[in-house]
């Protein structure tokens, strides 16, 4: 074990202070009755438009796709589910558009997005005798883009979709520069390369697509107006929630009591807004934002401040989860311990009215598990910076990534019925949760491990893999990027071929968590360094309204 003098050396990370402070305290605008009435009127018009569109027609497919990408599909869940089910049921029959690459690809993507397994054999008609996609397709930019987006719904060993991704990427890259700048298709291709639809955060995607869709001469004027009104109305709700959370955070005064930790309340709210943005999840969003802000604080305390002598009793107290354990906690951490217990007690009280307070057991279970994983990493560091075997580190890192905790806890505050069996399934680490956790850990380590090694910090998965397998840093990057790709395919598989039947909205929460990590850790750690791209995303979703 390391000496006690080494224990007293704090591995400070020097995180930058909050970008937002208490900026959102004043955002308390109410949604007016006039706004509600106007949105409802448009909604009924759009609903009628959707219902009356011929079943399985290109018109209906295009309308559903636009609704989803503009962020208004949640108003029409039942109608869309019925339409997609009918399209899927009829998919074995000959269709007039079966030789249209754009339509076949769009239909395939919409059906798979809805959780139905449509065979990728539908693309065989576009393959030549050499097993390659026909060169005659290269002039159909819209069709190529549609196929490119569809290829991201693939599962493992779907060679035709692997080939589709390679083929469309090559030809779209060579074509996009020839499209005029005012061409909405060019903007769509550019955005697809940056973030394919399958990996796009719904709210971020909606905000961007509103602008792209508006520049498309074929856009539906009513749908566009509805999307803008709905976006602005939802934004007011989100601002109000963030105002309430900011008041809670200000009262806790963590920024002053714990200046070593990342002060990222607004960023945490954005994270959870990525998981669910719909009005019915308002309570769940506020609960979950508090939880991940605490998880972020614990991460920094274990990783970037506390000594091992302080962490041991702190971890023990969290495992006990009992106010009577507070005296064993290091004095400066008692405020945080009390805050943790209060958050979960408030959750229990709120849910007791609906006879759902038993859900909080699973939230506590996962938080304890997360803290144990943080503590395990601290033990390795304390043991003369012991570098564990890659497989051992991987098992722990899958937990310390935080997504197992997040995937379970985000279900606690929702209004939908969730069975005990679903919660038990979730805490037993099903494939979709492990895949999401692996993506989170791999992407975090790829962009962050070198910065972390500049201070006293345990080895990341990258270092462990390099040491155990005798490979270079670049070879390790390739390995982990492959793991990320495989993780996405495993997530897709759980939607189409789940081992256990669970509600689709549960799977969607895990998918959205993964989309958040893909957005914030694609090029660098935007959460830790939140002054640039992340700040601009927050402005576009939570500060600036859409011009009607």
From Swiss-Prot:
Molecular function per GO: magnesium ion binding; terpene synthase activity
Binding annotation for Mg(2+) 1: 299, 303
Binding residues annotated for Mg(2+) 2, in chain numbering: 299, 303
Family that this chain belongs to: Belongs to the terpene synthase family. Tpsa subfamily.
Cofactor note: Binds 3 Mg(2+) or Mn(2+) ions per subunit.
Span of the annotated motif DDXXD motif: 299-303
Keywords per UniProt: Lyase, Magnesium, Metal-binding
Tissue: Mostly expressed in leaves, to a lower extent in stems, trichomes, flowers and roots and, at low levels, in fruits.
Gene name, Swiss-Prot/TrEMBL: TPS12
Residues that hold Mg(2+) 3 according to the record: 444, 452
Secretion signal span: none
Domain notes for this protein: The Asp-Asp-Xaa-Xaa-Asp/Glu (DDXXD/E) motif is important for the catalytic activity, presumably through binding to Mg(2+).
Catalytic activity: (2E,6E)-farnesyl diphosphate = alpha-humulene + diphosphate; (2E,6E)-farnesyl diphosphate = (-)-(E)-beta-caryophyllene + diphosphate; (2Z,6Z)-farnesyl diphosphate = beta-bisabolene + diphosphate; (2E)-geranyl diphosphate = terpinolene + diphosphate
EC nos: 4.2.3.106, 4.2.3.-, 4.2.3.104, 4.2.3.57
Metabolic or biological pathway, per its Swiss-Prot or TrEMBL entry: Secondary metabolite biosynthesis; terpenoid biosynthesis
Keyword Magnesium: yes
Gene3D superfamilies for the chain: Farnesyl Diphosphate Synthase, Terpene synthase, N-terminal domain
GO terms of biological process kind: diterpenoid biosynthetic process; terpenoid biosynthetic process
The protein's required cofactors: Mg(2+); Mn(2+)
Reported function: Sesquiterpene synthase involved in the biosynthesis of volatile compounds. Mediates the conversion of (2E,6E)-farnesyl diphosphate (FPP) into (1E,4E,8E)-alpha-humulene and (-)-(E)-beta-caryophyllene, and of (2Z,6Z)-farnesyl diphosphate ((ZZ)-FPP) into beta-bisabolene, gamma-curcumene and (Z)-gamma-bisabolene. Can act with a low efficiency as a monoterpene synthase with geranyl diphosphate (GPP) as substrate, thus producing beta-myrcene, (E)-beta-ocimene, limonene and terpinolene.
Protein known as: Sesquiterpene synthase 12
């Amino acid at each position: 074990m390391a000496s006690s003098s080494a224990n007293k050396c704090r591995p400070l990370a020097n995180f930058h202070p909050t970008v937002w402070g208490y900026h959102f305290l004043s955002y308390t605008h109410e949604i007016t009755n006039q706004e509600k009435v106007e949105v409802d009127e448009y909604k009924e018009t759009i609903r009628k438009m959707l219902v009356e569109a011929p079943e399985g027609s290109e018109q209906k497919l295009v309308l559903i796709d636009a609704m989803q990408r503009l962020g208004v599909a949640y108003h029409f869940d039942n109608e869309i589910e019925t339409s997609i089910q009918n399209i899927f049921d009829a998919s074995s029959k000959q269709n007039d558009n079966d030789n249209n690459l754009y339509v076949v690809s769009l239909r395939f993507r919409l059906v798979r997005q809805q959780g139905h397994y449509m065979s990728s054999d539908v693309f065989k008609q576009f393959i030549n005798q050499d097993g390659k996609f026909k060169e005659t397709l290269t002039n159909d930019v819209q069709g190529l883009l549609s196929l490119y987006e569809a290829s991201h719904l693939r599962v493992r060993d779907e060679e035709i979709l692997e080939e589709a991704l390679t083929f469309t990427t090559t030809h779209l890259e060579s074509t996009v520069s020839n499209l005029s700048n005012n061409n909405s298709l060019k903007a769509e291709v550019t955005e697809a390369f940056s973030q394919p639809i399958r990996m796009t955060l719904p709210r971020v995607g909606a905000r961007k697509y509103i602008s792209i869709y508006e520049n498309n001469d074929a856009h539906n004027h009513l749908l566009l107006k509805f999307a803008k009104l709905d976006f602005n109305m939802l934004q007011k709700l989100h601002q109000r929630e963030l105002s309430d959370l900011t008041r809670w955070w200000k009262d806790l005064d963590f920024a002053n009591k714990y200046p070593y930790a990342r002060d990222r309340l607004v960023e945490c709210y954005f994270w959870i807004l990525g998981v669910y943005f719909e009005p019915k999840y308002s309570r769940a969003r506020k609960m979950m934002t508090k939880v991940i802000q605490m998880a972020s604080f614990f991460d920094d305390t274990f990783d970037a401040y506390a000594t091992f002598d302080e962490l041991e009793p702190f971890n023990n107290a969290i495992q006990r989860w009992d106010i009577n354990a507070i005296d064993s906690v290091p004095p400066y951490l008692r405020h945080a311990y009390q805050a943790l217990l209060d958050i979960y007690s408030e959750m229990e009280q709120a849910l007791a009215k609906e006879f759902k307070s038993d859900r909080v057991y699973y939230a506590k279970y996962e938080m304890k598990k997360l803290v144990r994983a943080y503590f395990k990493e601290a033990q390795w560091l304390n043991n003369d910076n012991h570098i564990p075997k890659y497989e051992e580190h991987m098992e722990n890192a899958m937990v310390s990534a935080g997504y197992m905790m997040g995937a379970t806890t985000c279900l606690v505050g929702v209004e939908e019925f969730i069975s005990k069996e679903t919660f038990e399934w979730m805490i037993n680490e099903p494939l979709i949760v492990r895949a999401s956790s692996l993506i989170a850990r791999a992407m975090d380590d790829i962009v962050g491990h070198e910065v972390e090694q500049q201070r006293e910090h345990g080895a990341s998965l990258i270092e462990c893999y390099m040491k155990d397998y005798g490979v270079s840093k670049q070879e390790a990057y390739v390995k982990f990027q492959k793991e990320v790709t495989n993780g996405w395919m495993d997530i897709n598989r759980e939607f189409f071929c789940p081992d256990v039947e669970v509600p689709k909205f549960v799977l969607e929460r895990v998918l959205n968590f993964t989309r958040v990590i893909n957005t914030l850790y694609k090029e660098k750690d935007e959460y830790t360094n939140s002054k640039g791209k992340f700040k601009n995303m927050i402005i576009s979703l939570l500060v600036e309204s859409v011009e009607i």
